[in-house]
Amino acid sequence: MSEAVTRIHVGGTAGTDPYEVLVGRQLLGELAGLIGDRVKRVAVVHPEALAETGEALRADLAEQGYEAVAIQVPNAEEAKTVEVAAYCWKALGQSGFTRTDVIVGVGGGATTDLAGFVAATWLRGVRWIAVPTTVLGMVDAAVGGKTGINTAEGKNLVGAFHPPAGVLCDLAALDSLPVNDYVSGLAEIIKAGFIADPAILELIEADPQAARTPAGPHTAELIERSIKVKAEVVSGDLKESGLREILNYGHTLAHAIEKNERYKWRHGAAVSVGMHFAAELGRLAGRLDDATADRHRTVLESVGLPLHYRYDQWPKLLETMKVDKKSRGDLLRFIVLDGLAKPTVLEGPDPAVLLAAYGEVGE
């Protein structure tokens, strides 16, 4: 039986239904309720690292009367390729998967990105449920409806807006998460603090070491606050036509770093460097005060997130950023802060200012 559950409402926009994000412990008992009793088949997409979890979930669903199949995919970003998506499509076809059936994505952010993309493209869209097992997956990837895969040209360049029918954030899954993976997810939580909810930063600053562990006293509150920030934003702007862009704070440089590292860097580590860069860019552009810019470094460093990347890689990173999804024509666009919790767009910054900002990041 599940314990106390926090339910966070994500409002639907034109053409999409609202859904709930459930946060608590021992939540898998809630899954059948989200799937529904009119569904015949369920496909559980899971990474190799969660083979036992995926099979146990498949068996449990089968016991409840569903025709359940487990689809194992590579770990992390290696799953986000068109070849892996095609493998999933083949498995769905062989299972006789119809438009009334449901996909369940179990794993980190990369797995839920893939599962959502497969759901968006199979039969032009089937329902799916996210069961994120990492901090990053809970506070970012599984909430909001952005799904996608990577290409040789960049991260998440092929995808669809396809919100889940529900999200189960079982905090018990974090207990066995490697510390580096847990800390990586804190970058997205810290991002939420800077763009919208400074109370998040205060909770972390009060005890940075406690924030580094799922056993910390504020773990549930940090995750719930971060999800609420994203839920509020995406409820008003599903397809990133305006407000939702603020969620990309730190991500323009981060995605370029990830591509440059062939997706071997943790997403949160790249976002941390990206936020440091965005803070310096905001400062040098005359938008952000020194105290808030400096606060980026102290908060990120206090939980063990990186601040720097190789200086000599700037030309390659700049070229990658030019094909970023947020760019408009040849115009580079960055999310910066006008102050704490005051995100805005900086369009076409002076190349010299960009280089100077990266000079604070490069090593």
Swiss-Prot record:
Pathway given in the UniProt record: Metabolic intermediate biosynthesis; chorismate biosynthesis; chorismate from D-erythrose 4-phosphate and phosphoenolpyruvate: step 2/7
Transmembrane intervals: none
Keyword NAD: yes
EC number: 4.2.3.4
Compartmental location: Cytoplasm
Cross-referenced InterPro entries: Dehydroquinate_synthase (IPR050071), DHQ_synth_AroB (IPR016037), DHQ_synth_fam (IPR030963), DHQS/DOIS_N (IPR030960), DHQS_C (IPR056179)
Cofactor(s) annotated in UniProt: NAD(+); Co(2+); Zn(2+)
A molecular function GO annotation: 3-dehydroquinate synthase activity
Record key words, sorted: Amino-acid biosynthesis, Aromatic amino acid biosynthesis, Cobalt, Cytoplasm, Lyase, Metal-binding, NAD, Nucleotide-binding, Zinc
CDD domains, sorted: DHQS
UniProt entry tagged with the keyword Cytoplasm: yes
Annotated family: Belongs to the sugar phosphate cyclases superfamily. Dehydroquinate synthase family.
Biological role stated in the UniProt entry: Catalyzes the conversion of 3-deoxy-D-arabino-heptulosonate 7-phosphate (DAHP) to dehydroquinate (DHQ).
UniProt-recorded name of the protein: 3-dehydroquinate synthase
Protein's organism: Streptomyces avermitilis (strain ATCC 31267 / DSM 46492 / JCM 5070 / NBRC 14893 / NCIMB 12804 / NRRL 8165 / MA-4680)
UniProt gene name: aroB
